[in-house]
Amino acid sequence: MVSDIKEYYQCILDNLTGGLISVDLSGRVVYMNPMAGKILHMDEDHKCLGCDYNKAYAGFPALLGVVKEALETGKSVRRAEISVMHANVPLVIGYSTMRVKNHDGKELGVTVIFQDISFVASGKK
């Protein structure tokens, strides 16, 4: 049996093959996994944990819109796409959003899970 369940959960999030970012209801970045940083080309120093998501993801207007809509509407999105630019290269990002609630049903924030699907979207394999 796992001795430290919190560490185990953290390892699961850190080892996801897709990107995951989570923002609390006040708009503060709570978590960004390593793959999210890799997809968005943001290193450890630029994760902005605790920062307002508008500052953290200012270079990605479409991603800002996804987070804003999730926070404002509370609606979950399944399997949608956005385009983001990185170093003048467009990336097609497939994403889903979900509300984060505690065991009592209290809403805590939103999470966006995503992948770079540029090669799939362009028809390349």
Question: Model segments located where?
Answer:
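Terminal output helix/cap of sensory domains in signal transduction proteins
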Residues: 7-8, 39, 46-89
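PAS/PAC sensory module
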Residues: 81, 92-95, 111
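Sensory modules in modular signal-transduction proteins
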Residues: 1-40
